Amino acid sequence: MEIKKWLNTTITRRDAIVATAKVGAAVTLSQAITLPFATTAQAQDTPTPKDANGETVRHSACLVNCGSRCPLKVIVKNDRIVRIEPEDAKDDAVFGEHQIRPCLRGRSSRWRVYSPDRIKYPMKRVGKRGEGKFKRISWDEATAFIAAELTRVSEKYGREAIYYNYQSGAYYHTQGRPAWIRLLNLTGGYLNYHNTYSTAQIATATPYTHGDYVGSHFTQIAHSDLVVLFGLNLSETRMSGGGQVEELRRALETSKARVIIIDPRYTDSVITEHAEWLPIRPTTDAALVAGIAHTLITEQLLDEALVNRYCVGYDRSTLLDTAAPNASYKDYVLGTGDDGIAKTPEWAADITGIPATRIRQLAREIASARACYICQGWGPQRHANGEQTVRAIQTLPALTGHFGRPGTNNGNWPYGTPYGVPLLPVGKNPIKTSIPCYLWTDAIQHPEKMTATTMGVKGADRLKTGIKLFFNQAGNTLLNQHGETNRTRQILADESLCETIIVIENHMTPSAMYADLLLPETSYLEAEDLVDSSYAAGSHNYMIAIQKTVKPMWEVRSTYDICADIAGHLGLREQYTEGRTQAQWAEMHYQQIREKRPYLPEWSVAKEMGVIDQRIATEQQSLAFADFRADAEANPLSTPSGKIEIYSQALADLAQAWTLPEGERIPALPEFCPAKESHLNKTLTAKYPLQLSGFHTKGHTHSTYSNVLMLHEAVPDEVWINPIDASARQLKSGDRVHVFNDRGVVELPCKVTQRILPGVAAMPQGAWTRLDGNGVDVGGCINTLTSHHPSPLAKGNPQHTNLVEIKRA
């Protein structure tokens, strides 16, 4: 059935009109908890029968995308969550007294479950897309419609017209994304994506420098005497006990290393790590590295023989014959390269805002350190020139020899070591075509422009068709988290482009408002699964069995069951389920793990434990490039040369093959490439003089928890502005202001603080967009202001690169 005809059919079963809850509806109560660990040694801390008060203990975990994975001990009475408490079972033999305690967001989980924003029933759209008007329908009708749409779109346009959007709202193993991908692969495949909104630039650029993406765990800082962090803010982005911040602090307690944090904001990490703050202009990190390199070279502070042993392209002696004679990084820094500009500390100071004397001093400090741990967060790479920032920071430890030795890193952000919990098998996607995840709106609006050499399409020379059937599950990137939301609204509102949008969600998010079919899935406190520690658990890794702490309310369902029903309408239920329920898949995964780790308890015991097992990475696993440093020939990197490639011939070739927009470059060296929207663009800054960068607030994880008002009371969303800039605009803290540029206007309070560099403003990302009658985003979403124009190499999101003006509302 065509989508328009289906939307206009009369429903005979429960055909009440369901008005959407207003975005950001109030939740008025709060409940604080603290959370630790459970292990196999503490199996006695399993849920027990009801106590004298009729309360039962159940176990779950916070599954959002903060990088941690914190266990939640949920107290239930009469099938209702009454509070969340610390999980007090632990084994000091593994991590000492360390307990994985959730942050204030995880502690507010029950308010998400009982939020007035919850989607209760399957619904179809009535009225225009984005109006938020829906009609309740049955599950049978909803799943039958999806099955019919999969068939219709496949027959009319081909499977490339079916797209499953990037999402990170819930990291399940046997439902959520794996369940949907299993269904789509089973039914013929779908248009895939590559990269993520978090790491597009660093994930794309790193292979050209290092090959594989690896980094030393923060435990290595126990052996360091100096720590230099570019835009890394663990105290806010990884603030729970399940994250890396605990590891960092313990390592610093051991080493007493000096910490330098380079960031436009004086972050909480500067405070908690007792660090020196070097405020820097956004987008200019590569210029800082070049200025440091100039001092290293001219003051003979580096060992050139060592650099040439492990690197390609530092000087002319290691350049390939295909490169120009003066194409080395040393030529670039000293001004004997093509641009003829010496990258002196004075040159770098004019760009970065860091005084030349401090740049020289920093170079000397890094060069003289016994073991310097150099690391970058993901914020610096989320810029229009992010790939160059990534490669420049990776070059710094290569130049100074601070890699592959205890207490060092290679410049990368270190992923955690996973425990190894399997995912639901998804099968193989017959469709090999993949697009950069940030360019799905282009694949809807202008598919004819989506080619391998213009838009980074992989697996094919170009797209054959636009996206016609769109799945958006547990994610808000359909609107809220995507750049330039006003542009996105216009594309989604045009029903002649993407014909059907299916949203699977817990809450009526801004993205959910644009659904044609809206399906309610279980929250993680209503779900069951076996899950892994997440990507930012550091050297800690563990496994958690999560239970249905309460019965799924209303008509919400597991995505595994939803997909099984869709498969059933297509005659594929048995192939989809293989005769197993979701719980049986989790049990099977556990048995697979237990075969390798026979000390684990029986599943009947383990599934009641919460945290079942916990492990810690070895010293060898925690140190990046150790084998390479010991013997580069015997243990080469996975780059073409087997070495650290400061000059990348692969990038030089790509720059020749690709067609780039005017003014954009893909250099073979980690050069500083000015961003269009930076303080260096005098034409734009005459109109919009402030650089605006986003940051991860403690009040919500991306857009998850953004509708829990008690968190806003604890951590309000405010735009940070320096007193100098505030005084020029006659602003004081608490004033409601308009932050604006050509892409839109956002209204929110301002915070006047010396913790932000003059000329720079900062706004937390993740607030739910909500336009008033004048088109002003009174929800406070930074993406009303951010650009959709992608970065040159990764075609990634440049959402921290913006120019704006601020005035009183």
Which stretches of residues belong to each language-model region?
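Glycine-rich phosphate/diphosphate-binding loops that line cofactor/substrate pockets in enzymes
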Residues: 143-162, 217-227, 339-340, 360-373, ...
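N-terminal export/assembly segments and adjacent metallocofactor-ligating motifs
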Residues: 2-301, 473, 727, 771-809
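Extended redox/cofactor-interaction regions of prokaryotic respiratory oxidoreductases
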Residues: 2-5, 177-262, 287, 395-514, ...
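A glycine-rich phosphate-binding loop feature that marks nucleotide/adenosyl-phosphate handling sites
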Residues: 309-312, 366, 410-420, 579-592
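Conserved short loop/turn motifs at secondary-structure junctions
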Residues: 165-172, 347-351, 377-384, 415-417, ...
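Long, well-ordered, tryptophan-enriched scaffold segments
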Residues: 265-369
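Long, contiguous, secondary-structure-rich segments that constitute the structural scaffold
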Residues: 549, 555-609, 701-705, 709-720, ...
